[in-house]
A protein has these predicted regions:
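Intrinsic disorder in cytosolic terminal tails and internal cytosolic loops
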Residues: 1-24, 224, 411-420
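Substrate-agnostic recognition of the 12-TM MFS/MFS-like secondary transporter fold
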Residues: 32-49, 73-86, 92-107, 124-180, ...
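A single, central transmembrane helix in multi-pass transporters
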Residues: 39, 47-51, 183-191, 227-289, ...
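Helix-loop junctions on the cytosolic side of multi-pass membrane transporters
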Residues: 145, 149, 190-220, 409-420
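Transmembrane alpha-helix termini and helix-breaking/packing motifs in multi-pass membrane transporters
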Residues: 50-59, 112-117, 173-192, 265-266, ...
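Juxtamembrane intracellular "pre-TM" segments in multi-pass secondary transporters
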Residues: 12-32, 204, 209-244
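C-terminal transmembrane bundle of multi-pass solute transporters/carriers
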Residues: 79-83, 90, 94-106, 110, ...
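Juxtamembrane helix-start elements in MFS-like secondary transporters
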Residues: 62-70, 125, 270-278
Length: 420
């Protein structure tokens, strides 16, 4: 226990201007700029990404090709993210953030121009979407290393909770905004996305805090630094636990979400009813994120992680026997309600146990592990539902959740720190 508690101390020095600050993170000018940049980025991306396949379909391309563009874009982001993490731990992070935003703006701006002119070229859209995702991954890698510089340790829990609430709100508002813009004209969401990236660049540039990572000694070869980030995560028991738990939860929740959509469609539910499922889940996630800092300050961190893991077992089992669309929505809303508190606990402790010079690499390793399995969830859910039926898939997920909960319970000692 003693060794684990020592690791709770910040591994890198805090800047003087944030060392003694105890105000709400949102009252900090630079954190507010950072928070707003992420909100604008998320809204623009949600507004365009959901409707880009529709634009390709409208141009006469097949659904398979439209799906290929989306898949290539996602894979490009996953591949670039660990590479960007190395450079985000080498270079000043703020220039990386606004430069990446400008690249993404140019990529989406070029698609906007071609769509507005009525000349949609598949290869151009594919390349632009891949570049946009790669730039977004670069921005995310640099951003993942900033929290320690913008917020003092006692503010980590609230800051991460605010970031969670922002992301959940974007998931609710973004698709609706995109739908409204698409009704105006099919190129309007693309223009909004390009403009949003320009705003992100301006907001990132306006941050005054020095976000340059701490360095110890000369720069090592790229491959060595890439491997160092992976080795650090593998060598730190808590971070290994985060990788397993996050990857497992993302895969299972993704499968459950798509199971609910497929099952509702099979029961004759229309688009509005299926949209209700996603809306209820989004509202649950938003409420959970808003409540997370309050809960984390009052409940031991280990209890939050193990308790949430076990609660997901009956929830998944309940989905196996649900027969109405609103039931799917309420059950998924319940899951979404409890996950943010666990995320706040895990992310707060991950920042505390990681040296500043490794923050971006740590963040990209965890993010790639979690997102990589989530990409496979829709395909896996579709195949399994078609082969075994929705009820069997939901019960299988419940069994997998039970295994994950047992793993979390056996590793509860790793989550020794109360949230600050």
């Amino acid at each position: 226990m003693g060794e684990a508690e020592e690791k709770l101390e910040p591994s890198g020095p805090l800047l003087p201007e944030v060392q003694h600050r105890s105000i709400s993170p949102l009252r900090s000018r630079d954190f507010l700029l950072f928070w707003t940049a992420g909100a604008v980025d998320g809204l623009g991306t949600c507004a365009s990404s959901l409707f880009l396949p529709l634009i390709l379909l409208g141009a006469g391309h097949s659904a398979g090709l439209a799906g290929l563009v989306a898949s290539v874009a996602l894979v490009s982001g996953l591949v670039v993210s660990p590479v960007a993490g190395v450079f985000a731990d080498r270079w000043p992070r703020k220039p990386m953030m606004y430069a990446a935003a400008l690249v993404a703006a140019c990529a989406m701006g070029s698609v906007f121009v071609t769509v507005a002119l009525g000349h949609v070229v598949l290869v151009h859209v594919l390349v632009a979407a891949a570049v946009e995702q790669a730039a977004s991954a670069t921005y995310g890698a640099a951003a993942s290393g900033t929290i320690r510089r913008l917020v003092p340790p006692e503010g980590y829990t609230r800051a991460i909770g605010y970031l969670q609430a922002r992301d959940q709100a974007v998931q609710i508002v973004g698709p609706t905004l995109g739908g409204v813009l698409y009704q105006l004209s099919r190129w309007v969401p693309l223009l909004a996305d390009a403009v949003s990236f320009l705003l992100v660049a301006v907001l990132s540039k306006a941050i005054r805090t020095d976000l340059t990572p701490d360095r110890e000694g000369p720069v090592a070869p790229f491959t060595r630094e890439l491997a160092e980030g992976l080795r650090f995560v593998c060598a730190e028991p808590f971070l290994r636990f985060v990788v397993v738990w996050t990857a497992g939860i993302n895969a299972l929740l993704g499968a459950l979400y798509f199971h609910a959509v497929f099952a509702s469609h099979a029961q004759g539910a229309g688009p509005a009813a299926i949209g209700l499922i996603l809306t209820l889940a989004g509202v649950g996630g938003l409420l959970g994120a808003l409540a997370a800092p309050w809960l984390v300050r009052r409940v031991p961190a280990a209890r939050i992680v193990t308790g949430a893991s076990w609660v997901m077992v009956p929830t998944a089992a309940g989905l196996a026997f649900a027969s109405r669309t609103w039931t799917y929505g309420l059950l998924l809303s319940g899951v979404s309600l409890i996950v943010p508190s666990v995320v706040v606990v895990l992310q707060t402790r991950a920042v505390l146990v990681t040296p500043d010079r490794l923050l971006a690499r740590m963040g990209t390793v965890l993010g790639t592990a979690g997102q990589g399995v989530a990409v496979l969830a829709p395909v896996a859910a579709g195949v399994l539902v078609a082969e075994y039926g929705g009820r069997a898939v939901a019960l299988g997920c419940a069994g997998a959740f039970a295994g994950l909960a047992l793993y979390a319970t056996s590793r509860a000692r790793l989550v020794v720190g109360e949230a600050l």
